[in-house]
Regions:
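A residue-level signal for conserved active-site and pocket-lining positions in enzyme catalytic cores
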Residues: 7, 29, 52, 82, ...
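An anion-binding loop in the catalytic cleft
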Residues: 213-305
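Active-site-lining helix/loop region of Rossmann-like oxidoreductase modules
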Residues: 178-236
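Structural motif corresponding to alpha-helix initiation and N-cap regions
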Residues: 13, 42-45, 67-71, 89, ...
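N-terminal Rossmann-like dinucleotide-binding module
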Residues: 1-39
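Donor/substrate-binding cores of folate-linked one-carbon enzymes
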Residues: 22, 32, 81-200
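Internal alpha/beta domain cores that form substrate/cofactor-binding pockets in large enzymes
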Residues: 2-4, 25-29, 55-77, 82, ...
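N-terminal beta-loop-helix "entrance" segment that forms/cooperates
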Residues: 35-55
């Protein structure tokens, strides 16, 4: 099929690779503009742009599509279908209605749950047992279109957002490629979303990543998994931030939150249960295991962290 692809980050790049491998004709690629990255602010192309250029596909990087400035170009490209994966720009009706088969979007949640920019992370943060991928027919709303296909997958209780994202990326690319022939054949039955059951998955930030030892052990465990690899969950002790990259929730005997129960591994009481701080990054220091962190603070059982 003749496809115009729109996407920006790694998950979009993997989907674009899969579309090339499946033999589709990619007539053009829209992505966000190159941006400065890292401490040296090196101007860096989006992953999707790199994949497109490797295949000799024309790349377009407009600031917006909403002003109609790209309508003529999109019409000239004459796509049968527009595929959108984490593009980052809103598509106006003129674009949505341009292709024969309209526009479809890959969303990495079981819609209508977790509409928005961070569905994988919020599934982990909330301790969900399952998530999945959805292919929807796009409309003018935010992840509100009719669902064409969805596929469920289990979330492991120790899985981080990064690990889960790798799995949903692979599943999403596969399901996307399986869906397109069904669109061409007209065999899919779009299912309207139940908007009353919709939930949102807003973007994460560093402040949101904070937890307290007065939280439950289950909450802390989910927060540490869900905020990994970015922005990393953290708490404050002695006036300094400590990031936690790996932990384990365990039982306690009802000790006061913050009480050190053991140092090998470092185990601290919470509001409900206890948490083993397996790997941490103290502010201004290198990553270390929890036992080394406890030794540096000369902690012993019975102390308060």
């Amino acid at each position: 099929m003749r496809i115009l692809f729109m996407g920006t980050p790694d998950i979009a790049a993997e989907c674009l690779k899969a579309l090339y491998a499946a033999g589709h004709e990619i007539c053009g690629v829209y992505t966000r503009r190159d941006k400065p990255v890292g401490r040296k602010q090196v101007l860096t192309a989006p992953p999707v742009k790199e994949v497109a250029l490797e295949h000799g596909t024309p790349v377009f990087q407009p600031r917006t599509l909403r002003d109609g400035s790209e309508d003529a170009n999109i019409q000239a490209l004459a796509p049968e279908l527009i595929v959108v994966v984490a593009y980052g720009c809103i598509l106006p009706r003129s674009v949505l209605e341009a292709p024969k088969y309209g526009c479809i979007n890959l969303h990495v949640s079981l819609l209508p749950k977790y509409r928005g920019s961070a569905p994988v992370q919020w599934a982990v943060l909330n301790g969900d047992a399952e998530t999945g991928v959805s292919i929807m027919q796009m409309d003018e709303g935010l992840d509100t279109g009719d669902v064409l296909v969805c596929e469920k997958m289990a979330i492991d209780s120790e899985e981080t957002s990064g690990e889960l994202f790798d799995r949903v990326t692979a599943a999403g690319a596969r399901v996307l490629c399986e869906t397109i022939p069904q669109i061409a054949a007209g065999t899919l039955k779009p299912q309207p979303q139940d908007h009353a059951n919709a939930t949102l998955a807003p973007m994460l930030d560093k402040e949101l990543a904070e937890f307290r030892l007065t939280d439950s052990a289950a909450h802390i465990h989910n927060w540490v998994r869900g905020m990994n690899p970015w922005p990393m969950a953290w708490f404050v002790t002695g006036g300094r931030k400590v990031k936690v990259t790996e932990c384990r929730a365990v039982a306690s005997n009802g000790e006061a939150p913050g009480t050190v129960l053991a140092t090998k591994p470092l185990t601290v009481a919470c509001a409900d249960g206890a948490i083993q701080l397996l790997h941490v990054v103290p502010e201004g220091k290198k990553p270390m295991d929890g036992t080394s962190f406890a030794a540096g603070l000369r902690l012993k059982a019975g102390d308060t962290l």
